[in-house]
Amino acid sequence: MRHSKRTHCPDWDSRESWGHESYRGSHKRKRRSHSSTQENRHCKPHHQFKESDCHYLEARSLNERDYRDRRYVDEYRNDYCEGYVPRHYHRDIESGYRIHCSKSSVRSRRSSPKRKRNRHCSSHQSRSKSHRRKRSRSIEDDEEGHLICQSGDVLRARYEIVDTLGEGAFGKVVECIDHGMDGMHVAVKIVKNVGRYREAARSEIQVLEHLNSTDPNSVFRCVQMLEWFDHHGHVCIVFELLGLSTYDFIKENSFLPFQIDHIRQMAYQICQSINFLHHNKLTHTDLKPENILFVKSDYVVKYNSKMKRDERTLKNTDIKVVDFGSATYDDEHHSTLVSTRHYRAPEVILALGWSQPCDVWSIGCILIEYYLGFTVFQTHDSKEHLAMMERILGPIPQHMIQKTRKRKYFHHNQLDWDEHSSAGRYVRRRCKPLKEFMLCHDEEHEKLFDLVRRMLEYDPTQRITLDEALQHPFFDLLKKK
């Protein structure tokens, strides 16, 4: 039995994930924080809609204005970007990866056979906390443990650094030319030479080795780890180079939502990928738009005369799932707190225990965000989060309330929530029953919302499984094609 104990990282709710920037080859971005007030004003997004999409365009315009009024980027998600220092640059073809700058939890040195560590990875003791640590004339770390490197440096006599894609609390990600593979460009995650980050990286490596060996051709769309090595105490993981994250595409498209046909294609791939994890007795635990990356994020731009603006439309909706550092096997120790706030399932908030269904809840949240351009659970407070759920999905089931240890959220088996408080008014103003978020009431939109509603079932035992989701009528058009 696996019982690798995880230590809770103090910045759990303020973490960025390893996936989104870490594999990205092109578009360095300004960090999402209180100090960041610009929203890529230079971007010229594209979308193309048919008349049958009803009032999609008008509703999207209203959603966009409402969304910006909420200062979503600066106020609702900035805490997931602490330590992230991206920079903007442009190239002919956009591609992207995500930085995972702090792990939700780190496994201890006890591990199962599946996670048996590779013997060739040398172990390094904790190093002194000097302002600048030097091991040799050419190998230096800064005061935080980041490897000091620059364009032109070569790792392992093979990977020539082209540029830094981003930095985070965990380390940095660089784009490299792989001289051992005919000059192919790759993304290399260079983890800080700090014990907890090395352990987190090795944990991710073990999961990736398992998944990549089980699915060597990436049929199930988990990011491919090409290799890993130790560079003077820094764990370095080499990944394929991918495109923008789905979150960044939305952001750079002025938070316009995806077309429903694209949502269908992306949703099917996500369900297939995470179902593959579930069949391998794994739960991802940190699914969100930042951790879903496009293989190529190329797009076409067209002018929308109705909205009087340029909009972007994807050329290819192929995706990969990234960030397996928090993935947990069924028989491992399960940390009490998992998932990024906006995508956290009710059983996690209520400390009722969790397993694979928490991933399904996260996917439901992701799909509604793809549809609207913003997340419906915009909060950092657990009680407010539960109030939003009740406003959107109806009352929390009594049996879940009675079982939870989180009694502080309830009074007489009802959510202890004042609808007339400022927070109560905020929730009432911003949230509404799920179906009222529909932008069009044609059959395909109805099918999507039926799928989302089944994914957002409170009781994890009643929540749709991904095997069942893949058979949902929303995906019938894909099967016909």
Swiss-Prot record:
The modification Phosphoserine is found at residues 136, 138. InterPro entries: CLK_kinases, Kinase-like_dom_sf, Prot_kinase_dom, Protein_kinase_ATP_BS, Ser/Thr_kinase_AS. Its main location: nucleus. It is found in: Nucleus. Its EC number is 2.7.12.1. ATP binds at residues 165-173, 189. Gene3D superfamilies: Phosphorylase Kinase, domain 1 (3.30.200.20), Transferase(Phosphotransferase) domain 1 (1.10.510.10). One of its GO terms (cellular component) is nucleus. Dual specificity kinase acting on both serine/threonine and tyrosine-containing substrates. Phosphorylates serine- and arginine-rich (SR) proteins of the spliceosomal complex and may be a constituent of a network of regulatory mechanisms that enable SR proteins to control RNA splicing. Phosphorylates SRSF1 and SRSF3. Required for the regulation of alternative splicing of MAPT/TAU. Regulates the alternative splicing of tissue factor (F3) pre-mRNA in endothelial cells. It is an enzyme of class 2 (transferase). One of its GO terms (molecular function) is ATP binding. This is Dual specificity protein kinase CLK4. It comes from Homo sapiens. The lineage of its organism: Eukaryota, Metazoa, Chordata, Craniata, Vertebrata. The gene is CLK4. TG003 inhibits its kinase activity and affects the regulation of alternative splicing mediated by phosphorylation of SR proteins. Autophosphorylates on all three types of residues. PANTHER family: DUAL SPECIFICITY PROTEIN KINASE CLK4 (PTHR45646:SF1), SERINE/THREONINE-PROTEIN KINASE DOA-RELATED (PTHR45646).
